[in-house]
Amino acid sequence: MKDGFIKVAAGTVDVVVADVQYNTEQILARMREADAAGVNLLTLPELCLTGYTCGDLFFSDCLLGAVEPALAQIVEASKGLYPVTAVGLPLRFGGKLYNCAAVIHAGQLLGVVPKTHLPNYGEFYELRQFSSAKTLEGKAYTIPLCGQNVPFGTALLFCCSGMQDYTFGVELCEDLWVPCPPSTRLCAGGAAIILNLSASDEVIGKADYRRMLVGATSARLACGYVYCSASPTESTQDMVFSRHHLIAENGTVLAENEPFASASLTVSEIDVQRLMHERHRTTSYDSVPGLQPVVFDQPLRETVLTRHIAPNPFVPPYDEQLRARAEAILRIQSQGLKKRVEHTHAKTVVLGISGGLDSTLALLVCVRAFDLAGRSQKEIQCVTMPCFGTTKRTKSNAVKLCEELGVSVREVNITASVRQHFADIGHDEAVHDVTYENCQARERTQVLMDIANQSCGLVIVTGELSELALGWATYNGDHMSMYAVNCSVPKTLVRYIVQYEAGSSAPSLREVLLDILDTPVSPELLPADENGQIAQKTEDLVGPYELHDFFLYHLLRFGSRPRKLFRMAKYAYGGKYSDAVILHWLKIFCRRFFQQQFKRSCIPDGPKVGSVTLSPRGDWRMPSDASGSLWLAEAEAL
């Protein structure tokens, strides 16, 4: 439960139809299993206490009379168990029979939720035996049950006293399939998780639709959704059920027991902090008052994580998705640049080409933009500006890349200019400090700006999102331009986009792109080593970009605090980095992220391509003089 992770489960109850005592033992077995697994919240199938397929036996006093004693047995047995459990059962109230979910925890019957939408078409005829909760007119009732006074109604919001974000509501099977499901009101009223007790039969194509429906509902409502369907041990007289379990969070299926698979429990963790952050930032997510809170006490525990946490959250896990993502990003970037060039009536674009990844991607975008505009690639002006740290490999790759793409390329060696500048300001060339480095970066920007003035062009900056987050750019140097095509593409994704382009390129261009991909990331502002190789490697100085991109994604997208970032990174990387290494770079990230906001407050225009970006005019509006002491203190305390 700490850090917002609620361990949820959908449980199998292999019923014997109408054998309430046998089914009770099965329910208790699942509850004990969930307790041993550290589950917070357990969902069992619809009408699992009796079996869903009892048919007209639901008119029998003998069957219905066995329900309350069995429920009392379950409530009593729950006294020593940790999970909150939702059990499906038939229940009489006010002279009518309702298809219900009873929510049980630690010897308490917290509440009973009746089903609202009863299917009465095709193979289903629930209205023959049951009444809809619509007859209750949305009112909340209290009923005597198992020696307790129990809330009864569809507007119950179950709230954990020890964690504000840990709230859930309940709907049953068909409730999910209608245009306005109860879950809409429940989530608008504050429920972070929806439990669905279901008995959905298996027919061709239905599992795919069900999976899509659960995922889409969790996305639309920004909620966690636990779906638990009935077992094949239900009557097969006219239907077959499949034991289909689904656990989804905000559009992503976290865990699934596929139809007819044999899992007794399907378990994952729903991050309620993440969900509430999503609702907080989405101001169109309206709230609805009028739900009845039902408070329960569940001690906070450290949840053992089992869900997948992607170590590279910006990068899709599958090749097909990655190719689609890369193509979509390139289209957004190139369309954005095309519009800017046309609007300004620019005759050319000018960019510094270094033989590194970022300038390579920027050039590829420029080529696409000029293709879209029907203009010659020769109107793209690339400039290589060698100085003290430039290596033969990067310079050669820069020139080859330009030649392969058919763009204009020229060299302006800035060594003499920088040395003159050192002399002008009285800086010793042997002192390789920040002045030594930044003089080169600013000289390069000046050259590009002046060439753009000469040719009525736009300077295209090559820096990307990860560098902006860390402030790894020279203020008014490579930080500045007239348009920033890479500004919302993180470093980990830049690599894959270039790789994607290499895969569809002619052999000679592919060879250059692959060598660029194989080159260490470096600004090349310090002299090369004795072998002429890159001596200044960015990731040795600021840390692994995959770690920083991980921190950046979860900080900006979900508001995660340092403690949670550290915990998730340890889990996601599975021992690739030691705890000490992760913590070291987390501290660096927190410090630099706050210190370097002043650079982000005045960055050039550029296209947003993903949900995480740092534009001061769009997604990230942070004061340049905000203090990061809270974040740093928490990181230091880990």
Stretch-by-stretch model annotation:
Residues 1-352, 368-377, 409:
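Enzyme catalytic cores with a strong preference for nitrogen-chemistry domains
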Residues 6, 23, 164-166, 223, ...:
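ATP/NTP-dependent adenylation/nucleotidyl-transfer catalytic domains that generate, transfer
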